[in-house]
Amino acid sequence: MNYQIVNIAECSNYQLEAANILTEAFNDLGNNSWPDMTSATKEVKECIESPNLCFGLLINNSLVGWIGLRPMYKETWELHPLVVRPDYQNKGIGKILLKELENRAREQGIIGIALGTDDEYYRTSLSLITITEDNIFDSIKNIKNINKHPYEFYQKNGYYIVGIIPNANGKNKPDIWMWKSLIKE
């Protein structure tokens, strides 16, 4: 696959395409985080602000996915967002973007990446039960993917679950927190 990695901040057309991808990809899931171009454009503008990292992947001069990284702690930053145009999903675009992001993060001295991956639509076993102090750790350990939740994509790329916020998005709608060390041992 021939592709080009581009800095979204350097081109207003890329920013517009990035906002469109954000709206299209999340609306396809039923997620209203960015229901329109105004909210999506605002999100893209925040993602391209310094010192954040934000870049996209072009195929045939068209943006098909993009990724961002922003400070969370001094040496561990938060991945936000990773989004791929629906017609390019499951074709390796996300993995390419993720590996490029990890390499750029290492070059800047970042030693870990954290991310939150919400389960707002009952796509994991965590959303099927009431999480309590007594069952939280077993529930995380025994998580099952019910309907193509992206946590498995991140696991395949070296991230692991470090915790959850049980009702982050409403009753039985957890935010699953994941992390990966970038230290090469």
Curated annotation (Swiss-Prot):
Q: Which reaction does it catalyse?
A: kanamycin B + acetyl-CoA = N(6')-acetylkanamycin B + CoA + H(+)
Which amino acids does the record list as binding acetyl-CoA? Answer: 147
- Which of UniProt's keywords are assigned here? Acyltransferase, Antibiotic resistance, Plasmid, Transferase, Transposable element
- Which residues belong to any copy of the N-acetyltransferase domain? 14-183
Q: How would you classify this enzyme at the top EC level?
A: transferase
E.C. code: 2.3.1.82
For this protein, the record's InterPro entries field holds:
Acyl_CoA_acyltransferase (IPR016181), GNAT_dom (IPR000182), MshD_Acetyltransferase (IPR050276)
What span is annotated as the signal peptide, if there is one?
none
What PROSITE patterns is this protein classified in?
GNAT (PS51186)
Does the keyword Transferase belong to this entry? yes
- Offer one example of a GO biological process linked to this entry: response to antibiotic
Keyword field contains Acyltransferase: yes
Q: Which GO terms describe its molecular function?
A: aminoglycoside 6'-N-acetyltransferase activity
Any matching Pfam family:
Acetyltransf_1
Q: What does this protein do?
A: Catalyzes the transfer of an acetyl group from acetyl-CoA to the 6'-amino group of aminoglycoside molecules conferring resistance to antibiotics containing the purpurosamine ring including amikacin, kanamycin and tobramycin.
What is the annotated quaternary arrangement, including any partners?
Answer: Homodimer.
Please report the name of this protein according to its UniProt entry: Aminoglycoside N(6')-acetyltransferase type 1
Give the organism the record lists: Citrobacter koseri
Taxonomic lineage is: Bacteria, Pseudomonadati, Pseudomonadota, Gammaproteobacteria, Enterobacterales
